[in-house]
Amino acid sequence: MNRIVAPAAASVVVGLLLGAAAIFGVTLMVQQDKKPPLPGGDPSSSVLNRVEYGNRS
């Protein structure tokens, strides 16, 4: 009976470790699948939505 119990226990341990690693990996992938927040521009210090072509005189 011990010839069956030891490999079965080892198989269960390896399966649990692989399952935990897979869950951890998927969790990391899902967390990193987001766009980073874009910093808002300061309207008083930039020329947002205004095209400046230079002096045309």
UniProtKB/Swiss-Prot annotation:
Keywords: Signal
InterPro entries, A to Z: DUF2613
Chain residue ranges for the region called Disordered: 34-57
Keyword check for Signal: yes
Signal peptide location: 1-32
Name of this protein: Putative secreted protein Mb0242c
Organism name: Mycobacterium bovis (strain ATCC BAA-935 / AF2122/97)
